[in-house]
Curated annotation (Swiss-Prot):
InterPro entries: Flavin_Rdtase-like_dom, NADH-dep_flavin_reductase, RutF, Split_barrel_FMN-bd. NCBIfam families: RutF. The keyword NAD applies. Catalyzes the reduction of FMN to FMNH2 which is used to reduce pyrimidine by RutA via the Rut pathway. This is FMN reductase (NADH) RutF. GO terms for biological process: nitrogen utilization; uracil catabolic process. Its EC number is 1.5.1.42.
Length: 164
């Protein structure tokens, strides 16, 4: 069996569209957040999702210690916020760029996110360079934004909500 090279894998994954999310935490280790597209549902009984986080990321120790997080799914027009949380911008500046509320777990919840999933990390599995965080959902908040936001082919794209 041949070993695939990293670039081939990344090029193929660029063909897989995914929602754009800002993952936040707050607790004993402090406040932190990052942009992620490696998020998906696991089961609805109990409601659980997963988030993949590189163990080499500057935010990893904070999430690892706090053991809570909020997945904030972005809507179209929130690309600048995604870029802030995806770069080297200081944490205080990231959070100052938007309006937040405190979720049930104490994590920051983006006021105008398409959906926010306030969670407790229930299990962590390490694979390669990343930890897979299995997250039990404590509460969900939805916003009636007209368009979703996805990352596809290395760029942002708006998704129109169908008219009812």
């Amino acid at each position: 069996m041949s070993t695939l090279d990293v670039q081939t894998f990344r090029d193929a994954m660029a063909c897989v569209g995914a929602a754009v999310n800002i993952i936040t935490t707050d607790g004993p280790a402090g406040q932190a957040g990052f942009t992620a597209s490696a998020v998906c549902s696991v089961t609805d009984s109990p409601p659980t999702l997963l988030v993949c986080l590189n163990r080499g990321a500057s935010v990893w120790p904070t999430f690892n210690e706090n053991r809570t997080l909020c997945v904030n799914t972005l809507s179209a027009g929130q690309e600048p916020l995604s870029n802030l949380f995806g770069g080297k911008t200081p944490m205080a500046d990231r959070f100052a760029a938007a309006r937040w509320q405190t979720g049930e777990t104490g994590c920051p919840r983006l006021e105008d996110a398409l959906a926010s999933f306030d969670c407790r990390i229930s299990q962590v599995v390490s694979v390669g360079t990343h930890d897979i965080l299995f997250c039990t959902i404590e509460s969900i908040t939805r916003h009636p934004a007209p368009q979703g936001l996805v990352w596809f082919d290395r760029g942002y794209h708006a998704l129109l909500r169908p008219a009812c």
